[in-house]
Amino acid sequence: MENSTEVTEFILLGLTDDPNLQIPLLLAFLFIYLITLLGNGGMMVIIHSDSHLHTPMYFFLSNLSLVDLGYSSAVAPKTVAALRSGDKAISYDGCAAQFFFFVGFATVECYLLASMAYDRHAAVCRPLHYTTTMTAGVCALLATGSYVSGFLNASIHAAGTFRLSFCGSNEINHFFCDIPPLLALSCSDTRISKLVVFVAGFNVFFTLLVILISYFFICITIQRMHSAEGQKKVFSTCASHLTALSIFYGTIIFMYLQPNSSQSVDTDKIASVFYTVVIPMLNPLIYSLRNKEVKSALWKILNKLYPQY
C-alpha cells in the first residue's frame, strides 16, 4: 500500500477538552469496557460449557460475543489510556491498525446479525427442515464467510483511506481513527477514496436487506398462526435479536445519514461512543436477561463453583 505521507503520528482530540470531564469519562469508559469483557467472555464460557446450548443460534451468539470483544477492544483500551495519561498521540501504524480492526469486526457483526436472522427464519418458517437446513457445515460456512467478508471490507476501507497523503494538520477530531475524520484530514483528492468507501459500505445495506427479508417472512408466518400462545413463543425467541438489531443499525444509520456540520461532528462522537463501547456491553445483557436457557446454564455453572450456596 503506497503512501507518501509526511505525518508519522496523529493526535486524537477525544470527546471533549474540558479538564473537569476527563476523570468521569475515564471511569465511565473503564467501567463499560470491564463489563463488556465480563459479559461477552462469560457468554462464550456459558455457551461452550453447556451442551444444551450447542445449537446454531448459540453458535452465532458466541461468535457475536467474540466480535463485540474485538471491536470494543480496538477502541476502548487506547481511549482509556489517553484519558488516564493525557497523551492523545497515536502512531500512523497504530491508527491504521485501530482503523482496520474496528472496521473489520464491525462488518463481521453485520454479517453475523444477518446469519442469525436467517437462522431465525429457518427455525420459524421451516421448522420441519431446520435440522437439515442449519447443519454444522452451513453454520461454519456462514461464520467463516462473515469473518472473510468483514476483514476483506476492512482491507478495502484501509487501502482507500491510508493511501492518501496527510501532510497538513495531524489532529483527528474524534476519540479514535474513524473514516470521516481521517478523510477530512487528508490533503489529497479524496473523491476516489470516498467512492471506494461508499461501495464497500454496501456490506451494511446488503446485510440489512437480508435481515429485513428474513423478518418479513417471519412476520407472515406469525400472522398465519392460529394460536396466540404460538405467536407469543415465536416472538419471544426473536425479541432479543430484534432489540440488538434495532440498536446496532439504528445507531449506524443515524450517524452516517446526518448532514456534515460542526454540530453533527459532536453528535457523531456521542453516537460513536454508543456503538463502539455501549452496544458491545449491552448485547450479552439483551440476549441473556430474557433467555431461560442461558440463565439456566449460568445457574448450573454457579452451582458447580459454589455448591454450598
From Swiss-Prot:
Glycosylation (residues): N3, N260
A Pfam family that the UniProt record links to this protein: 7tm_4
Entry annotated with the keyword Transmembrane helix: yes
Residue intervals annotated with topology Cytoplasmic: 48-55, 117-137, 221-235, 292-309
Disulfide bonds: C95-C177
Transmembrane stretches, start-end: 27-47, 56-76, 96-116, 138-158, 200-220, 236-256, 271-291
GO cellular component terms, semicolon-separated: plasma membrane
SUPFAM superfamilies: Family A G protein-coupled receptor-like (SSF81321)
Family label: Belongs to the G-protein coupled receptor 1 family.
Job description of the protein: Odorant receptor.
The protein's name: Olfactory receptor 5B21
Origin species: Homo sapiens (Human)
Gene name as annotated: OR5B21
